Amino acid sequence: MDGKRKFNGTSNGHAKKPRNPDDDEEMGFEAELAAFENSEDMDQTLLMGDGPENQTTSERWSRPPPPELDPSKHNLEFQQLDVENYLGQPLPGMPGAQIGPVPVVRMFGVTMEGNSVCCHVHGFCPYFYIEAPSQFEEHHCEKLQKALDQKVIADIRNNKDNVQEAVLMVELVEKLNIHGYNGDKKQRYIKISVTLPRFVAAASRLLKKEVIMSEIDFQDCRAFENNIDFDIRFMVDTDVVGCNWIELPMGHWRIRNSHSKPLPESRCQIEVDVAFDRFISHEPEGEWSKVAPFRILSFDIECAGRKGIFPEAKIDPVIQIANMVIRQGEREPFIRNVFTLNECAPIIGSQVLCHDKETQMLDKWSAFVREVDPDILTGYNINNFDFPYLLNRAAHLKVRNFEYLGRIKNIRSVIKEQMLQSKQMGRRENQYVNFEGRVPFDLLFVLLRDYKLRSYTLNAVSYHFLQEQKEDVHHSIITDLQNGDEQTRRRLAMYCLKDAYLPLRLLEKLMAIVNYMEMARVTGVPLESLLTRGQQIKVLSQLLRKAKTKGFIMPSYTSQGSDEQYEGATVIEPKRGYYADPISTLDFASLYPSIMMAHNLCYTTLVLGGTREKLRQQENLQDDQVERTPANNYFVKSEVRRGLLPEILESLLAARKRAKNDLKVETDPFKRKVLDGRQLALKISANSVYGFTGAQVGKLPCLEISGSVTAYGRTMIEMTKNEVESHYTQANGYENNAVVIYGDTDSVMVNFGVKTLERSMELGREAAELVSSKFVHPIKLEFEKVYYPYLLINKKRYAGLYFTRPDTYDKMDCKGIETVRRDNSPLVANLMNSCLQKLLIERDPDGAVAYVKQVIADLLCNRIDISHLVITKELAKTDYAAKQAHVELAAKMKKRDPGTAPKLGDRVPYVICAAAKNTPAYQKAEDPLYVLENSVPIDATYYLEQQLSKPLLRIFEPILGDNAESILLKGEHTRTRTVVTSKVGGLAGFMTKKTSCLGCKSLMPKGYEQACLCPHCEPRMSELYQKEVGAKRELEETFSRLWTECQRCQESLHEEVICSNRDCPIFYMRQKVRMDLDNQEKRVLRFGLAEW
């Protein structure tokens, strides 16, 4: 519903049938809905049976019937989408502990025929390692097992699971420590296998703090791999990766049915049991890169709130739920319906399911979810609004069985609060609901993780990615539509259906599910973990897999923030200026991964401080077998030991090369998307390995690696600069001496002094090959682009026309300039864009200066639309050290209306208003709509001095020099200002309003208070009347155009516009013109009847 949408949006696809210009009713989304396949079957109401299991419903909703399977004769293949574990009882004939409870892994998935599968995997036990004390021998294992077992069981508080066995096995093994090179001789470690995942932490804690065996002390023995999640441990050891295909060979699995023991626990069509060492996990390449037709349910709810109060689940009813279900790989949703409270007029292309009672509607919807059996649940802000609201509302109304929305019959879906914090996403309050076997895939969450946008409302996102606007209904208006008739409820249903359809459009456009699925396959973690966890789990999973094959184990590291820092990447000091000649750009291909591979940088190759001499004596390690990095760290060369990280990176980049080659020959559009998602996931994964080593609060930080990588990067940038400038000289026969004008992390910009794009590109390619030949393989410098012209403003701030071929430019590329910054008003971005367009594309500096002057004049005279002045900032926390404008405004809005006030994690829109001199900016922030409605004057000086001046001077100083400020920010165009009189605040409440003459604006003399003109202007009454009527007519035409535009967006030219989309500039224009029109009508009415 709209209320949750500070996150809200549209859905407007490409209609399949041509639009009739005379057909006002059926446009855009409505036409698209009607044009879907089987639309004629959809326009009907269905009756549904009762109960959470096996109800009689539409066949269209059900999955295809499963085949008759015989485990002794058939293999079972399915793509798993979710991996989780639970505590169950041992199954006779399965490995592992034989007295319960035991951990069982559940894999949920889909077959190629579209049947849902629940696979119980038995016998896998959690374990960890500790260093073996020197006196510990093989014969001590059994004694340690019994002693530790007793300690762990005694440590259990309230043994409600009746655990009788905690430590299953103790073994003496030989492994290599991943951290640091100590030769190839394996060390002795004790492997401790326990019955339940929670006993890993308990056992390692007891070993550290208590006396387990009197004759041997374990307290100083370091623990290894005791911080690995059980699901990840299982996937690593069984070679399962996220979203890959699992095959159960005939004769090695059991099927559950109504006669089996144990009985089925899930709602899946096929439920099976298998031992952890009896199934085949296929690598997701070749034939096994295919994708099953898993079901995605996108839904949206509408609530009937009270005026001025955001809906509350205990009070405000759910009135509509719209649903769209699509199979992955198909373009159209095959299920389209809307559940409504009270009668609703039919909608072509959608089932309308009407209900008399809210409890009945919620009951039927939960039954619908169980029947459709979706694999993925999506929508917009469903985690923080739709799911919690539905569950809380159903609980309040005591709707029986509603909360059983997952695939396990006896597990309720419950709401859990969580605080998410990461460098990538900031700090956000989040709610999480469990749906065993179904993956919640909130589109808003995906966008917050992956895209930096000015606004995250569904409408803003829709416009950004799909170039479509949509009607946005405020939550206070929804109740009026619900309380109307079946036609107003139909309008609401269309709006609700759009908001369910749009996430599917955006998921397809952004390839979000395919990309995340491929990332899960590449990194080896479950799909849901990619959404709910940070970056480190992805690298950790890959590192564990590679370490397992080589006999390495990973020490447990307690996360502690460290003050120790390493020097970052080099930035060559920029030679600022406006370059009218072509500037060649040379980029290092995958710079940091290449450095790690070329110089064998890894945990396993690091020579720790103080061990060099020991290694020289014990391992005969020669000086020429060790490489000293520019950061003064030492690593053994690959001839001594090839590092794990370089091997991981090599396999990732080789797999990416294969995927890109396959992409070149693949013709199937969906397979192309999968391959493109795969190569992107492989690229991101390779680049994140370096970040894993540098994360100080992480699983395995190693500043020696990350510091060495950036140190090598710095020397390579400097070396590239020296090579280019020493080789490309007039003395060597070239046109001019080349100059490196800027270098940043992994690229250098070179001015070869040539005039043509062709020659600049030719020299760029030649220089890339020349410099690459000087570096260790696989470090490679590539020529990618030419900027022509190029505006170099400062470090990490530049703009230019981006050419990859000489005939035409690809785009205007900007970095660090206010065109791409989100914490400025759109006025800044639009002005910067227009200036850069005039400077770079039109090459008209004088025109750019004139345009800037005009915009500044418009700003000072109050001619800029308020939508261009809105600044947005994220409410990341409420306890900033200094007072912040958006935080103070959020507090002010909370006092006005707690329901609609911004919450933690939201982006807060505000404008800066005029106030007394020296008033701090945080006190001048105000809600844009409040400003419009109360004619609060804007602080134009703030926008000029704090928002526009610095960006403008940065762009124009390289062109105008020291005169830039006096030319742009001072002069004739800044002398005229318009001041708006506020209706609120200040002295407005104490002043008496007096009438003034409509002609000369002077106060009316005594005796003329009711007249429209003073005696001096009265002779010109006819002329002045015509002027006021003309002004009114202009405003009416403007309002009519804006109104019609909004009607077209809402797809009906006959209904009132009720949209309140604040991300749409027309919304503010419409509000302002409406107010101006009201004022102008009052001015005209002062003339009275035109009898004169």
Swiss-Prot record:
Which Gene Ontology biological process is one annotated for this entry? nucleotide-excision repair, DNA gap filling
Going by the UniProt record, its keywords in alphabetical order are:
4Fe-4S, DNA replication, DNA-binding, DNA-directed DNA polymerase, Exonuclease, Hydrolase, Iron, Iron-sulfur, Metal-binding, Nuclease, Nucleotidyltransferase, Nucleus, Transferase, Zinc, Zinc-finger
**What is known about this protein's pH dependence?**
Optimum pH is 7.2.
Give the molecular function GO annotations.
3'-5'-DNA exonuclease activity; 4 iron, 4 sulfur cluster binding; DNA binding; DNA-directed DNA polymerase activity; nucleotide binding; zinc ion binding
- First-listed, main subcellular location of the protein, grouped into a coarse class: nucleus
The entry sums up its family as follows: Belongs to the DNA polymerase type-B family.
Which tissues is it found in, per the record? Answer: Expressed in ovaries (at the protein level). Expressed in embryos (at the protein level).
The organism sits in which domain of life? Answer: Eukaryota
What CDD domains does the entry give? DNA_polB_delta_exo, POLBc_delta
**What lineage does UniProt assign to this protein's organism?**
Eukaryota, Metazoa, Ecdysozoa, Arthropoda, Hexapoda
Pfam families hit by this protein: DNA_pol_B, DNA_pol_B_exo1, POL3_N, zf-C4pol
Q: Which residues does [4Fe-4S] cluster bind?
A: C1046, C1049, C1059, C1064
Its recorded reaction(s) are: DNA(n) + a 2'-deoxyribonucleoside 5'-triphosphate = DNA(n+1) + diphosphate
Q: Which InterPro entries does this entry report, sorted A to Z?
A: DNA-dir_DNA_pol_B, DNA-dir_DNA_pol_B_CS, DNA-dir_DNA_pol_B_exonuc, DNA-dir_DNA_pol_B_multi_dom, DNA/RNA_pol_sf, DNA_pol_B_thumb, DNA_pol_palm_dom_sf, DNA_pol_type-B
Q: Where in the cell is it found?
A: Nucleus; Nucleus, Nucleoplasm
**Motif Nuclear localization signal at which residues?**
4-19
Report residue spans for region: Disordered.
1-71
Protein source organism = Drosophila melanogaster
Q: What is the additional note?
A: In eukaryotes there are five DNA polymerases: alpha, beta, gamma, delta, and epsilon which are responsible for different reactions of DNA synthesis.
- The gene name on file is PolD1
Zn finger (CysA-type) start-end: 997-1017
Protein name in the entry: DNA polymerase delta catalytic subunit
